[in-house]
From Swiss-Prot:
InterPro entries linked: Ribosomal_bL32, Ribosomal_bL32_plant/cyanobact, Ribosomal_zn-bd
GO terms under biological process: translation
Keywords: Ribonucleoprotein, Ribosomal protein
Name of a matching Pfam family: Ribosomal_L32p
Protein name listed in UniProt: Large ribosomal subunit protein bL32
Protein family according to the UniProt entry: Belongs to the bacterial ribosomal protein bL32 family.
Length: 56
């Protein structure tokens, strides 16, 4: 006979949710930091194309 599963507690659910939100916050912070370093030109791990001016 089918028996319903035990219900997880709200505190456990909130704990898992907090972990997920924390990981998302860390990823967002890294993305912001990377974007700032690219915009300022201080990023060392990227190769930027050099625009050559044509002289006539």
């Amino acid at each position: 006979m089918a028996v319903p599963k035990k219900k997880k507690s709200k505190s456990k659910r909130n704990q898992r949710h907090a972990v997920w939100k924390g990981k998302a916050a860390i990823a967002a912070q890294k993305a912001i930091s990377l974007g700032k370093s690219i915009l300022t030109g201080k990023a060392q791990g990227f190769v930027y194309p050099i625009e050559e001016e044509e002289e006539e």
